[in-house]
């Protein structure tokens, strides 16, 4: 694709997958926190003045069925942004969004730390088992 046809992020976009194999595949929204990242054609971009982390989390938690009802296609489904424009969503205040987003961000960090610890314990177990019967 020629560089002039690329879309670049501002760093606050919510990204919604446009292509999936199943209508329920569309609960993988995320937000792009970095500016100047090229965004592929198979991604719908939702620009918002709301907290993007909160928005992506809310979309994943509450709009999966709404998204699934709007997909088109058979073995490969498509979710076109035009089909999403008439979904009504209410947002709490920005302050509440910030608090909720921070809570989930901290929870994600905690999960990552525990996963890392679990991975290290698995390695230790493997090492101990290998050396136990030498």
What is the role of each PLM region?
Residues 1-134:
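Feature detects amphipathic, helix-rich regulatory segments
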């Amino acid at each position: 694709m020629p560089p002039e046809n690329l879309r670049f992020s501002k760093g606050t976009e919510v990204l919604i997958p446009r292509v999936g194999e199943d209508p329920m595949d569309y609960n993988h929204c995320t937000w792009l926190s970095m500016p100047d990242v090229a965004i592929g054609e198979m991604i719908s971009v939702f620009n918002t003045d709301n907290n993007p982390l909160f928005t992506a989390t809310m979309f994943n938690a509450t709009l999966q069925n709404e998204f699934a009802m709007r997909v088109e296609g058979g073995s490969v489904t498509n979710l076109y942004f035009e089909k999403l424009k008439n979904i009504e969503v209410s947002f709490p205040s920005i302050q509440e969004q910030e608090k909720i987003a921070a809570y989930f961000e901290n929870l994600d960090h905690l999960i990552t730390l525990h996963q890392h610890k679990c991975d290290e314990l698995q390695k230790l177990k493997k090492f101990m088992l290998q050396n136990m019967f030498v």
